[in-house]
């Protein structure tokens, strides 16, 4: 689950992480009032969307007086920002963060992530702050420094100081920077975050170490422990299909392709997307119906896939263990009949009750293409949508 920058900063403040004073605004008048309350000569008007790259897209402006605050707020509110993370459709700006300007002496990057390669939490830091960290990693990997964190001891002081030295934090601010990093790590752990990214972390002219931007994402599986985080959810920022899928406990992520995929099991779902790509297709989604899906759940999953107008065909790939193939078959047939399916449908079934499942599909009267293997199914659906 993602939250807005201003919400992330409020959480970090609770852990002693220093951030600029700011106010959220939903209208131009609220933006001007917020700037008045802050009482500084320079304010920053920042679009609040769940995506990076806002500055390059015109979503971050420095205002030197109240008239400029009004002008920039008018320009940004309601604007559709298109960044490298939003996709070509962009995101409409419905709220702003009005923040005190600060005297930036140097920008850095600090982030806490889950590293799949080591199976550990890793704190990363770089002197190349304010930039796309993926770009830095690709072009100048030697400029990114990492510390693997032992989950028992947590981030140690010496590790934080080592990172601060590595990225050339001024010597007199090393301890401040180390404290900042340790507070960031504690927030990451306490809130079950999946990423906590500060880009940029800045050193100011008056010797402060401050988070100028903050990105916090949270593990959806742990949200039951954090009703305070759930309350921060902004449904306007989420894909409607993903919201609908969550109501039925379906794991759905919209992608940019045209082949809908319905699979049971996250590993098989990823393998299915890979093999569709291998045969020249583009998956339209990741969709895991889980091991204990009911007919209703399968039917809803099918409907959600077909809400995507880009979908030109569907590949159902099921290995029945806990999930029974006849349940999947009934769900597919019911959904196809309800929505009067007129797009290619390839189904591969294996496992529990596979013969019964195939019988249900064969007797449905629907134009369903059977696949004998995952590769066979991927090849068939790719050829059918071309």
UniProtKB/Swiss-Prot annotation:
What PROSITE patterns does the annotation carry? ATP_GRASP, SUCCINYL_COA_LIG_3
Q: Which residues bind substrate?
A: 264, 321-323
Detail which positions bind ATP. 46, 53-55, 99, 102, 107
E.C. designation(s):
6.2.1.5
| InterPro entries assigned | ATP-grasp, ATP-grasp_succ-CoA_synth-type, ATP_grasp_subdomain_1, Succ-CoA_synthase_bsu_CS, SUCC_ACL_C, Succ_CoA_ligase-like_bsu, Succinyl-CoA_synth-like
- Taxonomically, the superkingdom here is Bacteria
Entry keywords, A to Z: ATP-binding, Ligase, Magnesium, Metal-binding, Nucleotide-binding, Tricarboxylic acid cycle
Quote any Pfam family the record assigns. Answer: Ligase_CoA
Could you state a single Gene Ontology molecular function term? Answer: succinate-CoA ligase (GDP-forming) activity
Gene Ontology annotations for the cellular component aspect, listed alphabetically: cytosol; succinate-CoA ligase complex
Cofactor dependence:
Mg(2+)
Q: Where does Mg(2+) bind?
A: 199, 213
Catalysed transformations (reactions): succinate + ATP + CoA = succinyl-CoA + ADP + phosphate; GTP + succinate + CoA = succinyl-CoA + GDP + phosphate
GO BP terms: succinyl-CoA metabolic process; tricarboxylic acid cycle
Q: How is the cofactor bound?
A: Binds 1 Mg(2+) ion per subunit.
Task: State which pathway it belongs to.
Answer: Carbohydrate metabolism; tricarboxylic acid cycle; succinate from succinyl-CoA (ligase route): step 1/1
* Domain ATP-grasp: start-end pairs: 9-244
**Oligomeric state and partners?**
Heterotetramer of two alpha and two beta subunits.
- PANTHER family given for it? SUCCINATE--COA LIGASE [GDP-FORMING] SUBUNIT BETA, MITOCHONDRIAL, SUCCINYL-COA SYNTHETASE BETA CHAIN
According to its UniProt record, which protein family does this protein belong to? Belongs to the succinate/malate CoA ligase beta subunit family.
Name the NCBIfam families for this protein: PRK00696.1 (NF001913), sucCoAbeta (TIGR01016)
Q: What role does it play?
A: Succinyl-CoA synthetase functions in the citric acid cycle (TCA), coupling the hydrolysis of succinyl-CoA to the synthesis of either ATP or GTP and thus represents the only step of substrate-level phosphorylation in the TCA. The beta subunit provides nucleotide specificity of the enzyme and binds the substrate succinate, while the binding sites for coenzyme A and phosphate are found in the alpha subunit.
Q: What is the name listed in the Swiss-Prot or TrEMBL entry for this protein?
A: Succinate--CoA ligase [ADP-forming] subunit beta
**Which species is this record about?**
Brevibacillus brevis (strain 47 / JCM 6285 / NBRC 100599)
């Amino acid at each position: 689950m993602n939250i807005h920058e201003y919400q992330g900063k409020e959480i970090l403040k609770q852990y002693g992480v220093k951030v600029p004073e700011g106010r959220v605004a939903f209208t131009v008048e609220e933006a001007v009032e917020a700037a008045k309350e802050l009482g500084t000569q320079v304010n920053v008007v920042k679009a609040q969307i769940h995506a990076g790259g806002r500055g390059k897209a015109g979503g971050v402006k420095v205002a030197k007086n109240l008239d400029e605050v009004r002008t920039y707020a008018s320009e940004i509110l309601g604007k559709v920002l298109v960044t490298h993370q939003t996709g070509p459709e962009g995101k409409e700006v419905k709220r702003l963060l009005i923040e005190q300007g600060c005297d930036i002496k140097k920008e850095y990057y600090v982030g806490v992530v889950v590293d799949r390669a080591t199976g550990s939490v890793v704190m990363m830091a770089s002197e190349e702050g304010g930039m796309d960290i993926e770009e830095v990693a690709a072009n100048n990997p030697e400029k990114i420094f990492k510390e693997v964190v032992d989950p028992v001891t947590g981030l140690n002081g010496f590790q934080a100081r080592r990172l601060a030295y590595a990225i050339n934090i001024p010597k007199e601010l090393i301890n401040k920077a180390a404290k900042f990093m340790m507070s960031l790590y504690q927030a990451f752990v306490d809130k079950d975050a999946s990423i906590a990214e500060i880009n940029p972390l800045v050193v100011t002219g008056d010797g402060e170490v401050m988070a100028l931007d903050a990105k916090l994402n949270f593990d959806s599986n742990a949200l039951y422990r954090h009703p305070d985080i759930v309350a921060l959810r902004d449904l306007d920022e989420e894909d409607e299909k993903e919201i609908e899928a969550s109501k039925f406990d379906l794991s759905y992520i919209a992608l940019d392709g045209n082949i809908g995929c319905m699979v049971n099991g996250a590993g098989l779902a990823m393998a299915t997307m890979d093999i569709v790509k291998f045969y020249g297709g583009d998956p339209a989604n990741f969709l895991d119906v889980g091991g204990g899906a009911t007919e209703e759940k399968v039917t809803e999953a099918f409907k959600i896939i077909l809400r995507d107008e880009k979908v030109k065909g569907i590949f159902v790939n099921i290995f029945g263990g806990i999930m029974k193939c006849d349940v999947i078959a009934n769900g597919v047939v019911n959904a196809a009949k309800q929505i009067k399916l007129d797009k290619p449908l390839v189904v591969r079934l294996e496992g529990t009750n596979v013969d019964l499942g195939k019988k249900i599909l064969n007797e449905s009267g629907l134009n369903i293409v059977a696949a004998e293997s995952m590769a066979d199914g991927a090849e068939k659906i790719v050829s059918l949508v071309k």
